[in-house]
Amino acid sequence: MYYRITDEVALRSWTDRGFAYYRRGMRKPLPLPAHLAKTMLRCDGEHDIETTPTVMYLVLKGLIEPCGAGEGPSSWSAYHRCDNVCFPMINLMVTGRCNFNCLHCFNAADNAALMTEWSFADLLDLLDQAQECGVTSFQLTGGEPMVHPRFLDLVREIYRRDMTVFALNTNGSHLTQEVLDELRSIGCDPEMKISFDGIGFHDWIRRRKGAEESALAAMRLCVENAFRVQANTQVNRKNVHTMMPTARLLDDIGVHAMRLIRTTEVPRWEANAPDACLGLEEYYARMLDFCRAYAASGMGMDIETWQFVGMRPQDRSFYLKPVKFASGSHHNGGYCCNCTHIMAAVTSEGEIVPCNQMSGYLLKLGISLGNLHTTSLRELLSDGAYTRIANMDAQDLAAAGHKCATCPHFSYCGGGCRALGLLFSGETTTRGLTYEDPAKCLFFEGGWYDRVREALDGWTNLSPIDA
């Protein structure tokens, strides 16, 4: 009997893990036991194999299917060994250009407008390299990604290679019915992450008259067309008082999630509004007030407050971002960041960075972990400076000998956010990435765990720790 790997499954392996497989549309590969992989490798339409219990199991799981002799798997489904560390996703900044000039842009090292942009030829080359490295999906960002002259062509090329776009970060000003129709015709159904910084303040922070109106119109249009919408909302001393009415407006529109992001001390924001940052304790206090009010509001939109509390009104549950390893799972291992070890970030200059949120600060410090215009993606995703930082684990952080090494809370927070560790370390080299995140220190040492539990009494805590 002849078998083939189904068109909905792709078999892969990487240098840092054994066999794994993707299901179509899945962002992360699933591990595959060696004995199952050994059988799947023979399911190529060329080998006449016995229908054993293992084969039947693989058929029932939808991993293989009977076929005729010579009917092998598709090029996407066929086994491919990737000679690099596994990073299944890329956060791609396709252009630094933007039709806005936001006060807080974290991609910028100063107030100069970013003008760097990937050429379409280089983007196609990057997609081919990503395919060879086992990447399956992209988040597209900018600048404003849709100002790239070949934006829709880029999306088409991603899907032509059997990869997907799972999210689009946009200011919404270029979203039209025609664009949404074209995305759907391509098969692209991303989460629309649309910036909206509070009623009456969005135009100010984006430095564009009419930005608020266009962002709200874009959200309504996306909801009407059944795209999932997340509002990304900067929160600072200027606009924090608008967060509850803003949440009510977004919930009424049908936005499925609101992410409130503390406007951070990145170079451009420090130059433009140095006194507008909420201090860390001030931020926790204002966000706890917001969460308490939101819990009583009856709204159904999911909430995430940056580095603090996430809320799921549908089942009245909440989780705590500082608690990375909850009771029963805390340990001295585990990745420092749940994102950087699965998603590489690439800037419009071609720099590879742990996350785009720290790209402007790294640029200001003159720190480069590699550039795709001079080094291949495979090389950058092999064992080296970038992968050691992106895959830094809690043991690495403890070994650095800073505060985390002896902290009683370390087994829960794992050191916290590496971008904040660098930002507040005072260091000007990558050594700063090994310092503690002071926001997490404040959370545990300042009793914020208990304060959140008390404020959300009656809601299920998904991040319990041993009190």
Per-range role (PLM):
Residues 1-110:
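N-terminal pre-core extensions flanking Radical SAM catalytic domains
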Residues 24, 346-349:
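Short, acidic, Ser/Thr-enriched surface-loop or helix-capping motifs
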Residues 97-107, 354-357, 401-420:
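Local cysteine-cluster metal-coordination motifs and their immediate loop/turn environment
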Residues 107-116, 359-367, 410-453:
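Iron-sulfur (Fe-S) cluster-binding segments and ferredoxin-like electron-carrier domains
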Residues 120-141, 148-279, 283:
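Radical SAM/AdoMet-radical enzyme domain recognition
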Residues 126-142, 432-467:
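Short Fe-S-cluster ligation motifs
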Residues 281-324, 357-405:
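C-terminal accessory region of radical SAM enzymes
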Residues 336-341:
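Short, small/polar residue-rich loop motifs at catalytic or cofactor-binding pockets
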